[in-house]
Swiss-Prot record:
Gene Ontology terms, MF aspect: DNA binding; zinc ion binding
Locations listed in the record: Nucleus
PROSITE patterns reported for this sequence: ZINC_FINGER_C2H2_1 (PS00028)
Native source species: Mus musculus
Annotated protein name in UniProt: Zinc finger protein 511
Keyword DNA-binding among record annotations: yes
GN (gene name): Znf511
InterPro entries (alphabetical): ZNF511, Znf_C2H2_type
Length: 227
């Protein structure tokens, strides 16, 4: 094996050993020290180049399918009753209690104890049934809000609102949002306030939830099916 003369000098310890070794370039390469021409390389689908990616994809899909097939287990606890006064629902899972509380007690009117499925419907109910200025303003401007929270439309009467919701939002024709509450027992401030309002036709009213019934003496076990 032939070594460059400068390397012999460095190995022998001669005076010129500290000088850097000369770099000799191939004259055929021109000014660039090397030649490189990019080109596309195509591998078949079953080539070993894709093996690692195929393994990772398989593990990812397997993990996703496992998560979808697994049904989350409910946190089972000893049976307990609803903590709201007058409610005798019995629960065996915390998820059932949370669903019940959200639907029945989460948006409850403080005047008449009616429960609504959303805060928007509760606000509309309080405005229309427990605001003494509502009927006065309704004679001058459109005050009946659309029950769809994302819809800004207002109407002159509740019947106009009902027609709008049936026609545009595809609500059922027999859909009812509210109706006069039947007085039971001593008169409440809300009942007295409702008595001072102008009488309205029951056919114009719409109802989402029925009037809360008196709690039965027996226990009722609550359950719901998760979607």
């Amino acid at each position: 094996m032939l070594l460059p003369p400068a390397l012999y000098s460095r190995l022998a310890g001669e005076p010129g050993a500290a000088e850097p070794l000369p770099v000799e370039r191939n004259p055929a390469a021109g000014e660039a020290p090397f030649r490189f021409a990019p080109r596309a390389v195509r591998f078949p689908r079953d080539h070993e180049f894709f093996e690692d990616g195929d393994v990772q994809r398989h593990l990812y899909l397997q993990d996703m399918l496992t998560q979808v097939s697994e049904t989350p287990e409910k946190s089972m606890v000893p049976e307990f009753t609803c903590q709201v006064a007058g409610c005798c629902q019995v629960f065996a899972a915390i998820e059932d209690y949370q669903h019940h509380y959200h639907m029945m007690h989460g948006n409850t009117c403080s005047f008449c104890n009616r429960a609504f499925p959303s805060g928007h419907l509760l606000d509309v109910h309080i405005l229309e049934w427990h605001d003494s200025l509502f009927q006065i303003l309704a004679q001058r401007q459109d005050m009946y809000q659309c029950l769809v929270e994302s819809c800004p439309e207002k109407f002159k009467t509740s019947q106009d609102r009902k027609d709008h919701m049936v026609r545009l939002h595809l609500y059922p024709a027999d859909f009812r949002f509210d109706k006069p509450k039947t007085n039971r027992g001593p008169a409440m401030p809300a009942a007295a306030d409702a008595a001072t309002r102008a009488p309205t036709d029951d056919s114009d009213a719409m109802e989402i939830c029925s009037e809360p019934a008196a709690p039965p003496p027996c226990r009722r076990t609550y359950s719901h099916r998760s979607v």
